[in-house]
Amino acid sequence: YISDHGADFPRSKGSIYESGTRIPMILNFPPRFSSGTVEKGMVSTIDILPTMLQAAGIGIPKQLPGFPLQELDQGAREGRKYIHTFTTGSAPALHFIQFGIRDDRYKLIYNPYRRKNLLAASRYINSKLSQDQHFEAFLFPDEFELYDLLNDPYEFKNLAYLVEYENKKIELLQRMRQFQKEINDPFLSKANLDVFEKEQLAHQKISYRKKAGFNWPHLDLFRKANIEK
């Protein structure tokens, strides 16, 4: 069992801030899992499929990025050192691309396009909250955001441009790029990102839903890129 990804508020559902990505996970499969245990290590929803495959006695394809949680329960491995997150805003009308990575204390967010965050704007306009000092930061976020989740759990103080946090920023960014390479992420290519960005912004009125046989152009582009690799 996992919950939905946060409340429908600014910086919550649909975003990659903690209130939109940190959710409970419950496993109940006796006797395959120990009962009454609480795992404090980090896991991800990408671990669900490998877990189910192993429980069913099916081999786990090597290309899957997740791992079976049975290994965690049996003490064969520790929780993840890094958790990766990503969003496009879930629909063209809410489009905003964000990449994220966190370790047990720090989180780095990469916003490749410095423009209005349509997802954040929609959540704000439809809420009854009064404007405050944090509104501008999530409506027009910096290219990089770095947060100390221990001392700043609500992610308000951006440390990404402070000299003393430069090494942590570089470490997390390198790990993010490494993971993208490992999973053959088409968005590792800036050209692919630009195509997708332009395409989504052109369809914000979602009129494509009325077009018979409509196909997103970026799908063919990404397939071609994978074949060429």
Predicted regions and their residues:
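Long, internal low-complexity/basic segments
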Residues: 22, 139-143, 149-151, 159-229
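Substrate-binding rim/cap in mid-to-C-terminal beta-strand-loop elements of soluble/periplasmic
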Residues: 10-79, 157
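C-terminal cap/loop subdomain of S1 sulfatases and analogous C-terminal strand-loop tails that border
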Residues: 7, 56-145, 183, 200-202
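Non-transmembrane alpha-helical segments in soluble domains
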Residues: 49-53, 57, 70, 98, ...
